[in-house]
Protein backbone atom coordinates (compact mmCIF):
# COMPACT_ATOMS: atom_id res chain seq x y z
CA UNK A 1 0.00 0.00 0.00
CA UNK A 2 1.15 3.54 -0.73
CA UNK A 3 0.44 6.23 1.86
CA UNK A 4 0.38 9.91 0.88
CA UNK A 5 0.33 12.53 3.63
CA UNK A 6 0.08 16.32 3.39
CA UNK A 7 -0.47 19.13 5.86
CA UNK A 8 -2.42 22.40 5.73
CA UNK A 9 0.82 24.36 5.83
CA UNK A 10 1.90 23.74 2.24
CA UNK A 11 1.21 21.53 -0.74
CA UNK A 12 4.12 19.14 -0.20
CA UNK A 13 2.94 15.53 -0.17
CA UNK A 14 5.01 12.77 1.44
CA UNK A 15 4.65 9.33 -0.12
CA UNK A 16 5.72 6.10 1.54
CA UNK A 17 5.33 2.42 0.70
CA UNK A 18 4.38 -0.03 3.43
CA UNK A 19 7.08 -2.59 2.60
CA UNK A 20 9.52 -2.19 5.45
CA UNK A 21 12.19 0.47 5.63
CA UNK A 22 11.94 2.52 2.45
CA UNK A 23 12.84 6.14 2.01
CA UNK A 24 9.93 8.50 1.57
CA UNK A 25 9.63 10.63 -1.53
CA UNK A 26 7.86 13.95 -1.90
CA UNK A 27 5.84 15.94 -4.43
CA UNK A 28 5.16 19.66 -4.60
CA UNK A 29 3.64 22.24 -6.92
CA UNK A 30 5.09 25.50 -8.30
CA UNK A 31 5.27 28.64 -6.15
CA UNK A 32 2.81 30.45 -8.41
CA UNK A 33 0.23 27.76 -7.55
CA UNK A 34 0.83 28.04 -3.80
CA UNK A 35 3.54 25.41 -3.40
CA UNK A 36 7.23 25.69 -2.62
CA UNK A 37 8.60 24.12 -5.84
CA UNK A 38 10.86 22.01 -3.59
CA UNK A 39 10.19 18.62 -5.20
CA UNK A 40 8.94 17.11 -8.43
CA UNK A 41 5.37 17.85 -9.43
CA UNK A 42 2.88 14.96 -9.18
CA UNK A 43 2.84 14.46 -12.97
CA UNK A 44 6.64 14.36 -13.03
CA UNK A 45 6.59 11.74 -10.30
CA UNK A 46 4.15 9.65 -12.34
CA UNK A 47 6.37 10.02 -15.41
CA UNK A 48 9.40 9.05 -13.29
CA UNK A 49 7.66 5.84 -12.24
CA UNK A 50 7.03 4.97 -15.88
CA UNK A 51 10.66 5.78 -16.78
CA UNK A 52 11.96 3.68 -13.88
CA UNK A 53 9.80 0.75 -14.98
CA UNK A 54 11.10 1.01 -18.55
CA UNK A 55 14.70 1.34 -17.33
CA UNK A 56 14.53 -1.67 -15.01
CA UNK A 57 12.77 -3.78 -17.65
CA UNK A 58 15.42 -2.95 -20.26
CA UNK A 59 18.26 -3.87 -17.87
CA UNK A 60 16.47 -7.06 -16.84
CA UNK A 61 16.36 -8.21 -20.48
CA UNK A 62 19.96 -7.12 -21.14
CA UNK A 63 21.11 -9.14 -18.12
CA UNK A 64 18.96 -12.12 -19.04
CA UNK A 65 20.40 -12.19 -22.56
CA UNK A 66 23.97 -11.71 -21.34
CA UNK A 67 24.42 -8.42 -23.21
CA UNK A 68 27.10 -6.06 -21.91
CA UNK A 69 26.19 -2.45 -21.07
CA UNK A 70 27.49 0.36 -18.89
CA UNK A 71 24.22 2.10 -18.19
CA UNK A 72 20.69 2.55 -19.46
CA UNK A 73 19.09 5.99 -19.61
CA UNK A 74 15.40 6.64 -20.21
CA UNK A 75 14.21 10.17 -20.95
CA UNK A 76 10.51 10.94 -20.89
CA UNK A 77 8.48 14.09 -21.31
CA UNK A 78 4.81 14.94 -21.21
CA UNK A 79 2.62 17.59 -22.71
CA UNK A 80 0.23 19.44 -20.45
Could you tell me what each predicted segment is?
Residues 1-48, 58-80:
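Extended beta-strand/beta-hairpin segments
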Amino acid sequence: MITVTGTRENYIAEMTADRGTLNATHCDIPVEQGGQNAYMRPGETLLSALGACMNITARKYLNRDGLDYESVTVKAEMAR
